[in-house]
Curated annotation (Swiss-Prot):
Its main location: membrane. It comes from Invertebrate iridescent virus 6 (IIV-6). GO terms for cellular component: membrane. This is Uncharacterized protein 135R. The chain crosses the membrane at residues 9-29, 41-61. It is a multi-pass membrane protein.
Amino acid sequence: MTKFTFSRFVIFSLFFTFISVSTFGNINFRFIVCKWTIFSFVALFYIFTHTSFTSLCFFGLRLFWHFFPRM
């Protein structure tokens, strides 16, 4: 992994952790932070080492429409 890829990886994992914390507030705070941090590190490590940025954007859009179909 290059430095740029690793920095993107860290930024996105922190971003997912922040979203999970701000979405759910203080409900099971530790559990949510641990779950999202582990999930984002594992998922993003695989995504950034196996896909390009364009396919990453399409993957994000697919996830968004899967979880928020009525927004």
